[in-house]
């Protein structure tokens, strides 16, 4: 006999692991140097620095780099991404309490709402950065050089997409409270004799 069912017990471990991976992606995005890179490798930028020397730089005034924190949009982008990261860490900690005890399932929708708020903060940051960077430094002045938003910027978007998905699941999980607690009979989508 073939039985196919839905096991909600896995959600107790999968969702915190997804949040942990989003935390790792956000750390990479916050600390990574590869937010923007020119095709001739003459410029590398991170969330914090713009380095215009051959091969880029690690980010310091001694290497001829310019701090993006001198601009209001640079501070806003960094603050929004960092606020989203802090909310994500808080939600990660709360998810253990909410998914371990039967009395704490009330917090699941709160966690989902906080994750949605963190996703909004990160989306704003990830949109402000390329728009204002392009306007401030006129990247289209030299048509021979192409600018590519690179791996660290992509990790920021990956963390944001995970946040959106986890927010949806945390908001929907209280509807399946009996399944999470193991009180419901298994529902089979298909049975064959």
From Swiss-Prot:
Expressed in skin, heart, placental, liver, pancreas, keratinocytes and dermal fibroblasts. May translocate to the intestinal apical epithelial cell surface via sipA and sctB1/sipC-promoted exocytic translocation following infection by S. Typhimurium. It is a multi-pass membrane protein. Gene3D superfamilies: 1.20.140.150. GO terms for cellular component: cell-cell junction; desmosome; Golgi apparatus; mitochondrion; plasma membrane. Keywords: Apoptosis, Cell adhesion, Cell junction, Cell membrane, Cytoplasm, Disease variant, Membrane, Palmoplantar keratoderma, Transmembrane, Transmembrane helix. It holds the Pfam family PMP22_Claudin. InterPro entries: P53_induced (IPR015664), PMP22/EMP/MP20/Claudin (IPR004031). Disulfide bonds: none annotated. GO terms for biological process: amelogenesis; cell-cell adhesion; desmosome organization; heterotypic cell-cell adhesion; intrinsic apoptotic signaling pathway by p53 class mediator; mammary gland duct morphogenesis; Notch signaling pathway; positive regulation of neutrophil chemotaxis. The chain crosses the membrane at residues 12-32, 79-99, 110-130, 151-171. It is found in: Cell junction, Desmosome; Cell membrane; Cytoplasm. Its main location: other. It is linked to Erythrokeratodermia variabilis et progressiva 7: A form of erythrokeratodermia variabilis et progressiva, a genodermatosis characterized by the coexistence of two independent skin lesions: transient erythema and hyperkeratosis that is usually localized but occasionally occurs in its generalized form. Clinical presentation varies significantly within a family and from one family to another. Palmoplantar keratoderma is present in around 50% of cases. Olmsted syndrome 2: A form of Olmsted syndrome, a rare congenital disorder characterized by bilateral mutilating palmoplantar keratoderma and periorificial keratotic plaques with severe itching at all lesions. Diffuse alopecia, constriction of digits, and onychodystrophy have also been reported. Infections and squamous cell carcinomas can arise on the keratotic areas. The digital constriction may progress to autoamputation of fingers and toes. OLMS2 is an autosomal dominant form with onset in the first months of life or in early childhood. Component of intercellular desmosome junctions. Plays a role in stratified epithelial integrity and cell-cell adhesion by promoting desmosome assembly. Thereby plays a role in barrier function of the skin against infection. Plays a role in mammary epithelial tissue homeostasis and remodeling during and after pregnancy, potentially via its involvement in desmosome cell-cell junctions. Required for tooth enamel development via facilitating desmosome-mediated ameloblast adhesion to the stratum intermedium during the transitional stage of amelogenesis. PANTHER family: P53 APOPTOSIS EFFECTOR RELATED TO PMP-22 (PTHR14399:SF4), P53-INDUCED PROTEIN RELATED (PTHR14399). (Microbial infection) Interacts with S.typhimurium sipA and sctB1/sipC. Belongs to the TMEM47 family. This is p53 apoptosis effector related to PMP-22.
């Amino acid at each position: 006999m073939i039985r196919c069912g839905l096991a909600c017990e896995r959600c107790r471990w999968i969702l915190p692991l997804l949040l942990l991976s989003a935390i790792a992606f956000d750390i990479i995005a916050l600390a990574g140097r590869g937010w923007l890179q020119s095709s001739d490798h003459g410029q590398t930028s991170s969330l914090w620095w713009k380095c215009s020397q051959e091969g880029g730089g690690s980010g310091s005034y001694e290497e001829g780099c310019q701090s993006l924190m001198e601009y209001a949009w640079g501070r806003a982008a960094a603050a929004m991404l960092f606020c989203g990261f802090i909310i994500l860490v808080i939600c990660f900690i709360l998810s253990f309490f909410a998914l371990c005890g039967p009395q704490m399932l009330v917090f699941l929708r709160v966690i989902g709402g906080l994750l949605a708020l963190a996703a909004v903060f990160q989306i704003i940051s990830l949109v402000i950065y390329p728009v204002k960077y392009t306007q401030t430094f006129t990247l289209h002045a030299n048509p021979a050089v192409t600018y590519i938003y690179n791996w660290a910027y992509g990790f920021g978007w990956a963390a944001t997409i995970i946040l959106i998905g986890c927010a949806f699941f945390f908001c929907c999980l209280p509807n399946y409270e009996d399944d999470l607690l193991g009180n419901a009979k298994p529902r089979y989508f298909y049975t064959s004799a």
